[in-house]
A protein has these predicted regions:
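Membrane-interfacial alpha-helical segments at the cytosolic side of multi-pass membrane proteins
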Residues: 58-74, 114-130, 286-290
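Extended amphipathic alpha-helical segments with heptad-repeat/coiled-coil character used for oligomerization
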Residues: 109-159
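Outer-membrane beta-barrel "beta-signal"
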Residues: 271-309
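Interfacial helix-loop-helix junctions of multi-pass membrane proteins
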Residues: 90-114
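Transmembrane beta-strand segments that form the barrel wall of outer-membrane beta-barrel proteins
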Residues: 176, 262-268
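Long, repeat-rich segments with strong aromatic
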Residues: 167-254
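Transmembrane beta-barrel domains of Gram-negative outer membranes and organellar outer membranes
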Residues: 1-74, 214-216, 222-236, 244-248
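Short loop/turn motifs that connect adjacent beta-strands in outer-membrane beta-barrel proteins
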Residues: 72-82, 126-143, 258-259, 290-294, ...
């Protein structure tokens, strides 16, 4: 990790050189092979530019911008600087967590930190860019109700979803729905009365991330998945996620403010480890347990914001 930060050029050269760096990490060249394969999932296992662009740059940029606006509203000086620094620190921790066995710097880490993470912070500090994504593309980040297990400290029900509701010309009651993460869902959003939106998408997600211990090259196994979301004016009320991913067959989240003013709940079903249930509160820690051989008490990682009903 330190080599990637302090010796980025050397890390790129050790990972195959500049050609591999541009071809696999930045440019969407793999899309051509995917199309030629008639959209075979196996040909999409190394399109690292996709999570780099949507996850690191756009999602990271939106997160930084939102944090900056929150800090600014609270009168914190140098809000953009603090928000950008916090976002980059989180990106470094994420790289350390996802690459625990690597002993040398990699071109992938260099790309994510210096090109996409930093680029997203800078890009979304521009008001015109932030306004375009918020008001034209209707981009938002919807998160699961992340929880910590006690006493193991395991992180459970943790996921961020970058979603878009893209306008359809001459259609006022529906939009094109796009959910991006490591995988992707494409579908439609139906605009209901009272500011409610119902979004349905289908696509694929990653079952397992494979990292070459020498080069740091990342590939993934792709599995089918689908999702359903209910929100009101962008505030997520409930979500349902189904997939063939072993560790996340079914996930249900009902957020605080949907059925109860302060409490929310979630359910996670896995292929081999039974299921887990959790309870959250918008302003205080809660707990949960599951009647299975792998049941543990769960505590929300942070208070959930109140959903606007």
């Amino acid at each position: 990790m330190l080599e990637s930060v302090f010796d980025p050029i050397g890390s790129i050269e050790r990972s195959g050189g500049w050609g591999v760096f541009l071809r696999e990490q930045i440019l969407p060249i793999q899309v051509v092979a995917w199309i030629r394969s008639r959209f075979d999932r196996g040909a999409a296992d190394n399109m690292t530019w996709y999570p780099n662009c949507f996850g690191h740059m756009i999602e990271g940029g939106i997160s930084s911008r939102r944090l900056a606006e929150k800090l600014r509203s609270q009168g914190v000086p140098f809000a953009s600087l603090f928000a950008g620094t916090t976002t980059m620190a989180a990106a470094v921790l994420n790289e350390m967590y996802t690459h625990p066995t690597l002993e040398h710097g990699t071109g992938g880490t260099v790309t994510e930190l210096y090109v996409f993470d930093l680029g997203g912070v800078i890009l979304f500090s521009n008001d015109a860019v932030a306004r375009f994504f918020a008001e034209t593309l209707h981009a938002s980040i919807w998160s699961n109700q992340a929880s910590l297990a006690v006493p193991s400290g395991e992180l459970a029900n943790n996921a961020n979803n970058l979603v878009f509701k893209l306008p359809i010309p001459f259609v006022s009651r529906a939009s094109l729905f796009l959910r991006t993460a490591v995988g992707s869902h494409l579908g439609a959003t139906v605009h209901l009365n009272g500011g409610y939106d119902l979004s349905l998408g289908r696509g694929a997600d990653t079952n397992r991330q494979n990292i070459d211990p020498v080069t740091g090259k990342e590939t993934v196994d792709i599995r089918a998945s689908a999702s359903l979301y209910l929100d009101r004016q962008g505030s997520l009320l409930a979500s349902l996620y189904w997939s063939r991913v072993d560790h996340r067959l079914l996930t249900v989240n009902v957020y605080p403010g949907a059925l109860h003013d302060g409490f929310g709940a979630w359910l996670l079903v896995t292929r081999n480890e039974g299921f887990q249930i959790g309870i959250s509160h918008r302003s205080a820690l809660g707990s949960a347990s599951a009647p299975s051989s792998h049941a543990e008490v769960r505590w929300p990682l942070w208070p959930r914001p109140r959903a606007r009903c």
